[in-house]
Each structure stands twice: as C-alpha cells, then as structure tokens.
Swiss-Prot record:
InterPro entries: ApaG_domain, ApaG_sf, Uncharacterised_ApaG. The lineage of its organism: Bacteria, Pseudomonadati, Pseudomonadota, Gammaproteobacteria, Pseudomonadales. The gene is apaG. Residues 2-126 form the ApaG domain. It comes from the Bacteria. It comes from Pseudomonas entomophila (strain L48). SUPFAM superfamilies: ApaG-like. Pfam families: DUF525. This is Protein ApaG. HAMAP family: ApaG. NCBIfam families: PRK05461.1 (NF003967). GO terms for biological process: error-free translesion synthesis.
Length: 126
C-alpha cells in the first residue's frame, strides 16, 4: 500500500529445528520469529493472517486464521509486535509468504504483505 499512514513492515528470522525434525519420514520443522513494525501514522490492529507455505516439490498449503498465536495486537505508530511460531514441511527446503489483514483506528482495512522467505535445512542450499 502506498499511503504512508498505513505502512506496516514485516521482518522474519528462521531457524531449523533439528530436534523436532525426522528426515527419514520427510518431516522438517522450522521456527520463525516475526516482527511487525508500524511505520505508519495511525494505530493498526492485526486482525488475521494468510499464509502460503510451499515445499520444495511445489506443493502449497494455505493457512488462514485470526490474529497471530492467539493474539490480535494493536500496534502504535513507531512500535512493533514480535512473536515466534513454527511450520513443518515435507522437504529440506521451502518458502512461506502471505499477508496480515490490518484494521486501522480510523476505520481503514488494509493488508500488510509478508514477502517470501526461505525455510531451509542448513547445508541444503549451496
């Protein structure tokens, strides 16, 4: 969205969870920590999420739900909300991308884009 009042930036850090993975059974677990930064000028509440999780074979799982980890945080301008969650995929490499549906205090509904990010077992990519 180009309107500077509704500027939400999303950053992601991922981590492979070796202890929760079972490669022989095509189970690869990852944790991710997301920071949702309100760089706009109005308060915005994160209402819901939409994820597209793609494994290395191109299979896509779509996930929708209210809030994030049971919360619908209200994020003040200049503030951020950070949370951690996880995903399990059936290949050593995959991607996640999506959006958060936001509701600004002035009544405007808008989407905050989550750019694609990689899930990868260490050493799986050269």
């Amino acid at each position: 969205m180009s309107d500077p009042r509704y500027q939400i930036d999303v950053s992601v850090v991922t981590r492979y969870l070796k202890d929760q993975s079972d490669p022989e059974n095509d189970r690869f677990a990852f944790a991710y920590t997301i920071t949702v930064q309100n760089n706009g000028t109005v308060k915005a509440k994160l209402m819901s999420r939409h994820w597209l999780i793609t494994n290395g074979d191109g299979e896509v799982e779509e996930v929708r739900g209210a809030g994030v980890i049971g919360q619908q945080p209200l994020i003040e301008p200049g503030q951020s909300h950070t949370y951690s969650s996880g995903a399990v995929i059936s290949t050593r490499v995959g991607t996640m991308q999506g959006s958060y549906q936001m509701f600004a205090e002035d009544g405007k509904r808008f989407d905050a884009t989550i750019a694609p990010f990689r899930l990868a077992v260490p050493g799986a990519l050269h």
